[in-house]
């Protein structure tokens, strides 16, 4: 006769995030001892971790916070949206984010090597992934600093945690600047710019786009004397797609993002944008 109850199974599932059959097997093996059962679940889960390493983890969440003028954002991945919306996975995202803030890490390797309750954060994430039964990985980390930093998180589904996150810094902290920063952060989430300014775009990327614009215009039979103006016009269109400050502002497309910032007495000085799986 089993030395545990249905309530014990429910409690252990809530503590570990493991499936019902895995919990029952662990309790059977542990003769009803909950702590021993947790250890069994961890061991069996970790044994399967190497098998999970090669699996794709393209679901998950983005978490972000701002403290003392420093914005920190992480992307935590798992394999399925079922785990992505689990309370235990969401709590793990908060642990990783808090560890990123506390450690001051600037990249994922440094974050995973940081200490967390007597072991590395990387080991803790692996252990939690074992309990969840999926490959769980910290994919990205961003830190953005400025006079004011806005953090914006966007849910693409009401059933899932945030899938898109933005950190956006400006060089002023007035009320107008803060409002503009938030509006531009929301814009950034929707329009996914790649670079802050034209100067940030690699020269080879610009030259390649210039060459394509020139060759395309020639193939269209445009007159030779009109080519320079046509090429520059197409380059401007290219910059409007990928450069944040050159993009038409979402709330008022007649203005650029850069103009919105300057009208608020500030400038955008940095940003980071994550979308789960991208």
UniProtKB/Swiss-Prot annotation:
Keyword check for Lipid biosynthesis: no
Family that this chain belongs to: Belongs to the EF-Ts family.
Subcellular localization: Cytoplasm
Record's function text: Associates with the EF-Tu.GDP complex and induces the exchange of GDP to GTP. It remains bound to the aminoacyl-tRNA.EF-Tu.GTP complex up to the GTP hydrolysis stage on the ribosome.
Residue numbers spanned by region Involved in Mg(2+) ion dislocation from EF-Tu: 80-83
The protein's name: Elongation factor Ts
Main location: cytoplasm
Entry GO MF terms: translation elongation factor activity
Record carries keyword Thylakoid: no
Naturally occurring in which organism (per UniProt): Micrococcus luteus (strain ATCC 4698 / DSM 20030 / JCM 1464 / CCM 169 / CCUG 5858 / IAM 1056 / NBRC 3333 / NCIMB 9278 / NCTC 2665 / VKM Ac-2230)
CDD domains recorded: UBA_EF-Ts
Keywords of this entry: Cytoplasm, Elongation factor, Protein biosynthesis
Cellular component annotations (GO), alphabetically ordered: cytoplasm
């Amino acid at each position: 006769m089993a030395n545990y109850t249905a309530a014990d199974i429910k409690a252990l599932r809530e503590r570990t995030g493991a499936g019902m059959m895995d919990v029952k097997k662990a309790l059977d093996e542990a003769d009803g001892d909950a702590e021993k059962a947790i250890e069994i679940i961890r061991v069996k889960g970790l044994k399967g971790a190497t098998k999970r390493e090669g699996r794709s983890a393209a679901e998950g969440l983005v978490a972000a916070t701002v403290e003392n003028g420093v914005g920190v954002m992480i992307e935590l991945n798992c394999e399925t949206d079922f785990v992505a919306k689990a309370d235990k996975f969401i709590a793990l995202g908060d642990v990783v984010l808090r560890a990123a803030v506390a450690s001051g890490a600037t990249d994922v390797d440094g974050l995973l090597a940081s200490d967390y309750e007597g072991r590395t954060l990387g080991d803790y994430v692996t252990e939690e992934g074992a309990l969840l039964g999926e490959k769980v990985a910290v994919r990205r980390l961003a830190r953005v600093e400025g006079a004011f930093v806005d953090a914006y998180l966007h849910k693409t589904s009401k059933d899932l945690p945030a899938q898109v996150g933005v950190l956006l810094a400006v060089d002023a902290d007035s009320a107008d600047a803060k409002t503009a920063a938030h509006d531009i952060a929301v814009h950034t989430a929707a329009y996914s710019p790649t670079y802050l300014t034209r100067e940030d775009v690699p020269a080879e990327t610009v030259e390649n786009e210039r060459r394509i614009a020139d060759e395309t215009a020639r193939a269209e039979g445009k007159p030779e004397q009109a080519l320079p103006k046509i090429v520059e016009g197409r380059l401007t269109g290219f910059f409007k797609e990928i450069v944040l400050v050159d993009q038409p502002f979402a709330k008022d497309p007649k203005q650029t993002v850069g103009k919105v910032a300057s009208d608020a007495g500030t400038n955008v000085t940095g940003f980071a944008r994550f979308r789960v799986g991208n």
